[in-house]
Amino acid sequence: MRLVLLNYGIWHDRRSALKFTDIDYFVFSDASKYVSIGMSPYMRDTYRYTPMLAILLLPTQYGFPSWGKYLFSISDLIAGWLMIKLLSRRISYKRSLIYSSFWILNPFVAIISTRGNCEAILGILSIALLYLIEKKSVWLASLILGFSVHFKIYPFMYGIAFLVYFSKPKKGSTFMEKFLSLLSINQLKIVVGSLFMFTICNLLMYYLYGSPFLEHTYLYHFGRTDHRHNFSLHHLNLYYESSFGAKASSLFAFLPQLSLCMLIPLVFGKKNLPGTLFAQTFAFVTFNKVCTSQYFMWYLVFLPLVLPNSKLLSKKGLICLSLWIIGQLLWLISAYNLEMLGKSVFIPLWLSGLLFFFFNVYELKIILDSL
């Protein structure tokens, strides 16, 4: 399926002004071009990623322009293979293949990767984390966690889940004794290893590219005002910020998001680690100031690991899927009228984003109930 989509994308792009290739892929490739001639990837406007992504895509500058699309598609498949390995430890191999197909054969996932979006790299890193944790390779898992946070900020929250997962039963009579009894050597490995890798990656990139690296890779994302292709309920606020220079409080937008991402692992992290990461990521994306289609990949990668013996396979799960699709369709209709037809539909677009948000909050409740 991915090979067909990759070839279709090449054919389509040659014949249509509306490209199959994601505009972000052109940004990645342009940044890689600057790296190939010894310049900073941040010479390319709107490149807001670690330089490592541009370095990974260097083959695009040497006769293989579709290299990144193949890399992301292969990453998808490797993530699927790791899912099968993880699921096979709990259920039969045949059932593992069935559940992993929700990722491997998912057209949404395949299209996102073959269009040239880099989220598949985060997918393989996320599944590799779980795989290594289950294999008791905690040091290696901690290094991958540190690299993941360097690559994109959001995996930092998985560290909270891992700390809870590796905590020991409470002992002692005083608060301090109970607190100290929770600590374990694996928690220390997670903290030390991830901080070490995160620091090394950042120091290296800062040495090579200086303050623009920090500004565009990290600082930009705390105050970003992207309003195009944004499913978030903050869409209209961000539009006014970007158009009129108004400034809403970013802190208030982050508070519910960060609170949920900390509370969910505290409640569920010990008993269901894959489910905790799924719920954490779903909550993070739902409450994020910017929410685009590729962000759904962040939590969909955990779905096959959560489905076995889950309430999501019941009627409630079907309702969740229906609401998830309907919410996106309603938003996309308004977005098409705005961006392609030039109609003034800001209020309907905001209302459809608000409805999608409420749908996702209901879905989050069902997910938490199933853990």
From Swiss-Prot:
Topology in the lipid bilayer: Multi-pass membrane protein
Gene Ontology biological process: cell wall organization; GPI anchor biosynthetic process
Pfam families: Mannosyl_trans
Main subcellular localisation: endoplasmic reticulum
Pathway where it operates: Glycolipid biosynthesis; glycosylphosphatidylinositol-anchor biosynthesis
Transmembrane segments: 64-84, 120-140, 144-164, 190-210, 248-268, 290-310, 318-338, 344-364
GO CC terms in record: endoplasmic reticulum; endoplasmic reticulum membrane; glycosylphosphatidylinositol-mannosyltransferase I complex
GO MF, one example: glycolipid 1,4-alpha-mannosyltransferase activity
Keyword Cytoplasm tagged: no
Key words, A-Z: Cell wall biogenesis/degradation, Endoplasmic reticulum, Glycosyltransferase, GPI-anchor biosynthesis, Membrane, Transferase, Transmembrane, Transmembrane helix
InterPro entries linked: PIG-M (IPR007704)
EC number: 2.4.1.-
Localization (cell): Endoplasmic reticulum membrane
Function: Mannosyltransferase involved in glycosylphosphatidylinositol-anchor biosynthesis. Transfers the first alpha-1,4-mannose to GlcN-acyl-PI during GPI precursor assembly. Required for cell wall integrity.
Family of this protein: Belongs to the PIGM family.
PANTHER family from the UniProt entry: GPI MANNOSYLTRANSFERASE 1, PIG-M MANNOSYLTRANSFERASE
Descriptive protein name: GPI mannosyltransferase 1
Taxon lineage: Eukaryota, Fungi, Dikarya, Ascomycota, Taphrinomycotina
